[in-house]
Amino acid sequence: MIPVASRASTIEYAIRDVVVPATKLEAEGHQIIKLNIGDPIAYPGLPTPPHMVQAYIEGLAQGNNGYSPSYGLPELRDAISKDEASKGWDCTNDDVYVCHGVTEALQIIFAATLEEGTKVLAPGPHYPPYMAYPQMYGASTIEYALKSDDGWAIDLDDIES
C-alpha cells in the first residue's frame, strides 16, 4: 500500500466526512437528504432544464466536445469580463480564467497565494474547502462568525477576538 503524505492525513473535508455517519443513519432507517456533493441529478425534482439539454445535443452534433483552451473559451471569457465590467470591475478577457468548478478555482487561488504559515480568515458557516484547502499549502484557517440576524454581515468583534 502506498503511504499517505503526512500533510494529507491531517486534512478534514466535511463535505465527504459526513457520508459515513449519514450512511449508518440510513441503514438504521433514518431518511437522509444528501446535499453534501451538489449533484442535482440525484434529486428527481431538479431535472436538467430543456434548453441546456438541447445546447448539449447541438454541441455534440457540431463536434464541440473536445478540450477547450486552457483559460476557457474566448467567447465565454468575453461574456464573463463584460458582465463583471458592467458591475464596475476593471475586467478584461485577460483577467478571466475559467475553471471546471469552485473546487479547482479555490485550489488554484490558494496555491498561487498561500505560503507556509499563512493564516486565512474564512466565514462561518462556510463551504468546507475554505477550511480544508489552505491546509494543503501549509496554511491554517481561522473561522469567523457571520451575523445571521443581520443579513449575514461580518461579525467584526469575532474577528478582533
Annotated model-derived regions:
Residues 105-106, 130:
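Short, hydrophobic alpha-helical packing/hinge segments within bilobed ligand-binding/sensory domains
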Residues 111-161:
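PLP-dependent aminotransferase-like
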Residues 6, 60, 123-126:
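Short linear sequence motifs
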Residues 4, 63, 148-150:
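Glycine-rich, flexible loop/turn motifs
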Residues 39, 74, 103, 127, ...:
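Residue-level detector of flexible, active-site-proximal loop/helix-junction positions
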